[in-house]
């Protein structure tokens, strides 16, 4: 069961081939002029250039073949050789009934599914998520859902930031503030010989009582700022980090407490966003792989000493860029920069952990493709890591891809901040969206018949839909301006508008059930029925483009057009008050099919629609 665009492309390809030309010229697209045609093929122009022939002559040959296609009511040539096609109402009726009967609403599964890992969100221990995590979380979640829906075997990994210097900062700050914990940690440099599970539980209980998430939230920013001004404290934190990574027993227990309480809070926020992960693997999970990996890189001849540090050169011969030196002179240097694997102090670096993570993923999951949903400002870093991984044989060339995204900006065009100039916490952003959704629902007179609990649940869904759709309607690589008033409107291209149309269709279906009207065979006749069927048929094309470009905006665009087109259909074609049973049954089936496809699209965007408003 192919969508019309694909099946007509196949027919046009055969027609070009029959004319002695490449079938590649037979690409059919939706018409730029829906008033003239449903589909168009511009291949005659490209074919004419290639074959040095008249384009209209070629178009005539192709049209002569296509005219025999029973699905086409008309095939005409426009201008110098554009081919316009109008689909027959019978063919549209057949296609509408196919989509209605299909649980996937016209979406085809992949012929050759792959194993795919999506690395997204990147939350950190002891750091509350902020608005910068919004895009990584919701774009990554949508890409994961899309790939899984298409048929790939997909794993979503949060790639938890649970290692590194921030841990040493926190340990040092807590030891300074809490004498009891300091004394406890000083006793637990190594695991005591007789240290039972009960003893360990007792220590963890002490940590739970004395160190809360609020404490981490308070201590980390202060410690981070202090280490910039206080070299002694910075050195203490570095030492604590090294001892933690070398296995100091008490530090490991306290670190585990940091991870536990941070993850509980993070899972709560991700749940509110409708985001979930198959894996919560952290940077700490690959630490044991780093030393043998470094030795392996050395054996492969990839590690190079550079002023006491150890690097992997990833630039190819001749790849250079101009660099301005402090004295003002300009020199040519290799580009991309080498990947720093081991610092001059002997520490493994951020890129080293990423490289070890690729190695770990290959061993545990062996994915055909790993997608990294991370801010596009990290593009250079990923280019270095990916090239190093390919050189080392840790991944097949082309199997690692950075799907970068732009920033969410304030009205000044700069990354969004609070009025005080700070970074807005994600929790606070979600609550702002909920509050604005409550206000919008009351303004529109919606939700008045709901219980308080149901109203709150609906407001949450509306708020999250507003945030997600505002983001996902843009191509991920572009930045956009945050405007909560516009995002939460029930009019225009917004998430709440899509939810309203979904709820509206559900209301129609409930009334139909009350009146005992049952859906039946779809018979396409009216222009609004044609338009709706053609858009339902376009679902597969939208999914295919979103999949190929790792870009959910194509799904968002389709969902919006579908909601708009249904609204026009409903205004032009009465459903329950239609003048005969067959028409009522047909239009009701179109409404059911629209709802099925709309909610499928919303689910792929990570948006949940309420039953009522």
From Swiss-Prot:
Instruction: State a GO cellular component annotated for this protein.
Output: cytoplasm
Q: Which reaction does it catalyse?
A: tRNA(Arg) + L-arginine + ATP = L-arginyl-tRNA(Arg) + AMP + diphosphate
Q: Give a yes or no for keyword DNA-binding in this entry.
A: no
Primary location group = cytoplasm
- A single Pfam family it belongs to is DALR_1
> What Gene3D superfamilies does the record point to?
Arginyl tRNA synthetase N-terminal domain, HUPs, Isoleucyl-tRNA Synthetase, Domain 1
Annotated EC: 6.1.1.19
Give the UniProt keywords, A-Z.
Aminoacyl-tRNA synthetase, ATP-binding, Cytoplasm, Ligase, Nucleotide-binding, Protein biosynthesis
Q: Which GO terms describe its molecular function?
A: arginine-tRNA ligase activity; ATP binding
Q: Where, subcellularly, is it found?
A: Cytoplasm
Q: Residue ranges for motif 'HIGH' region?
A: 123-133
Instruction: Report the record's Gene Ontology biological process terms.
Output: arginyl-tRNA aminoacylation
For this protein, the record's HAMAP family field holds:
Arg_tRNA_synth
Assembly and interactions? Monomer.
Query: Which named protein is this?
Result: Arginine--tRNA ligase
| Source organism per UniProt | Caulobacter sp. (strain K31)
């Amino acid at each position: 069961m192919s969508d019309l665009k694909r099946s007509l492309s196949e027919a046009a390809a055969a027609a070009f081939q029959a004319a002695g030309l490449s079938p590649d010229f037979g690409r059919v697209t939706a018409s730029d002029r829906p008033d003239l045609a449903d589909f168009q093929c511009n291949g005659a122009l490209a074919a004419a250039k290639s074959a040095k022939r008249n384009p209209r002559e070629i178009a005539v040959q192709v049209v002569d073949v296509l005219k025999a296609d029973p699905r086409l009511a008309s095939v005409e040539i426009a201008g110098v050789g554009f081919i316009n096609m109008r689909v027959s109402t019978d063919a549209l009726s057949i296609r509408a009934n196919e989509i209605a009967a299909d649980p996937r609403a016209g979406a085809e599964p992949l012929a050759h599914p792959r194993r795919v890992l999506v690395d997204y969100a990147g939350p950190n221990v002891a750091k509350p998520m902020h608005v910068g995590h919004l895009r990584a979380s919701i774009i990554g979640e949508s890409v994961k859902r899309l790939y899984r829906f298409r048929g790939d075997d997909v794993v979503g990994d949060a790639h938890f930031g649970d290692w590194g210097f921030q841990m040493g900062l926190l340990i040092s700050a807590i030891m300074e503030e809490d004498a009891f914990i300091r004394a406890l940690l000083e006793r637990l440099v190594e695991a005591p010989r007789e240290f039972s599970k009960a003893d360990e539980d007792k220590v963890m209980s002490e940590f739970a009582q004395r160190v809360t998430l609020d404490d981490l939230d308070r201590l980390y920013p202060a410690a981070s700022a202090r280490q910039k001004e206080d070299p002694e404290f910075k050195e203490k934190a570095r030492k604590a980090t090294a001892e933690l990574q070398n296995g100091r027993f008490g530090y490991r227990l306290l670190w585990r407490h940091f991870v536990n309480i941070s993850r509980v809070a993070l899972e709560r926020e991700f749940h509110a966003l409708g985001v979930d992960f198959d894996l919560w693997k952290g940077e700490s999970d690959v630490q044991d792989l780093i030393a043998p990996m470094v030795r392996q890189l050395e054996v492969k001849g990839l590690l190079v000493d550079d002023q006491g540090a150890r690097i992997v050169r990833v630039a190819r011969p001749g790849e250079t860029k101009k660099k301005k030196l402090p004295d003002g002179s300009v020199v040519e240097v290799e580009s991309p920069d080498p990947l720093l694997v081991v610092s001059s102090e002997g520490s493994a670096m951020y890129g080293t952990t990423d490289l070890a993570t690729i190695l770990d993923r290959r061993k545990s999951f062996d994915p055909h493709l790993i997608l990294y949903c991370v801010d596009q400002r990290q593009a250079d870093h990923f280019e270095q890591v990916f090239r190093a991984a390919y050189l080392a044989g840790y991944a097949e060339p082309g199997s690692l891809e950075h799907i970068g995204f732009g920033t969410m900006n304030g009205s000044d065009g700069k990354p969004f901040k609070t009025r005080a100039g700070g970074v807005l916490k994600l929790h606070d952003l979600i609550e702002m969206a909920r509050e604005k959704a409550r206000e919008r629902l009351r303004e529109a007179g919606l939700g008045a018949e709901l219980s308080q609990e149901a109203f709150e649940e609906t407001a949450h869904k509306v708020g999250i839909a507003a945030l997600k759709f505002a983001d996902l309607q843009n191509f991920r690589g572009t930045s956009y301006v945050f405007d909560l008033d516009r995002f939460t409107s029930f009019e225009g291209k917004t998430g709440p508008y899509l939810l309203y149309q979904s709820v509206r269709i559900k209301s129609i279906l409930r009334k139909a059930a009350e009146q005992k009207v049952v859906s039946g065979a779809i018979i396409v006749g009216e222009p609004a029925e044609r338009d709706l069927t053609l858009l339902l048929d376009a679902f597969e094309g939208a999914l295919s483009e979103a999949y190929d470009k790792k870009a959910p905006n194509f799904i968002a665009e389709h969902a919006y057009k579908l909601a708009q087109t249904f609204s026009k259909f409903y205004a032009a074609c009465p459903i329950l008050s239609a003048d005969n049973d067959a028409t009522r049954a047909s239009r009701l089936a179109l409404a059911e099919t629209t709802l099925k496809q709309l909610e499928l699209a919303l689910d792929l965007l990570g948006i949940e629609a309420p039953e009522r408003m």
